[in-house]
Amino acid sequence: RNGYTPVIVDRNIKDNPIAQQFNDVYEINLPKDIHLLDDIVKRYNIDSFICTAAYTSVGESVREPNKYYQNNVVMMLQLLNKMKELNVKKIIFSSSAAVYGIPETGICYDDQTGLEPINPYGQTKLIVEKMLKDYNRAYGINSISFRYFNAAGADPEGEIGELHDPETHIIPLIIKAGFQAQDFSLFGNDYDTPDGTCIRDYVHVTDIADAQIQALKLLDENIC
């Protein structure tokens, strides 16, 4: 697609109906299966990684920071070391707007906005961003990090959609409540907004996919 041949690696393929739709899909559970990447990289002549794997619940990261540092940081370190070993020099990393914390202006304007994460989840993303800079300087691994806000939406053709267990995302929960005629609870009434409720920025998953393709092209052209 778009000149690229994607190969999917997931730790639990059998419970992921979305992944099962594709042909080149492999089940790998880090760290014990990381050696399996050797054959995949060589078989497909892979020269770039797109890493979207992470634990993402802010609340859980506060309750269980060890779980988040182990999965989001240590596992990423192992992946970078494997890239170094296999001479894979390009990676796109899914970071998060959580690295910003609470900006003094109340709005994140650009990449010069201060980075002050206020929870372990945000800290793990910022740590990996710093790791990527170090691996670029020392080993020539080039990277682009996207600081996503709230990813949402589904494939316009209806082939893939949101898939969380348990579901915690607001849009699918609202849709579910509407279809099942259930009440929907919206929490928070003391934010500095016109009605006191939280305002969030959303980015559609197809826009994310398009951005990742453009990022791959930039890496291929050695622009980043």
Where would I find each of the regions flagged by the language model?
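Conserved glycine-rich Rossmann-like NAD(P)H-binding loop of the short-chain dehydrogenase/reductase
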Residues: 4-13
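NAD(P)H-binding glycine-rich loop region in Rossmannoid oxidoreductase-like domains
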Residues: 30-71
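Alpha-helical substrate-binding/gating segment
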Residues: 151-154, 172-193, 200-224
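Cofactor-binding loops of NAD(P)H-dependent oxidoreductases
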Residues: 26-30, 189
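Conserved active-site region of classical short-chain dehydrogenase/reductase
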Residues: 34, 73-81, 206-209, 213
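Catalytic helix-loop patch of NAD(P)-dependent Rossmann-fold dehydrogenases
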Residues: 63-78, 85, 90, 99-145, ...
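SDR active-site strand-loop-helix element
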Residues: 9, 49-53, 91-97, 146-151
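Short loop/helix-cap segments at secondary-structure boundaries that form the rim of catalytic
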Residues: 15-22
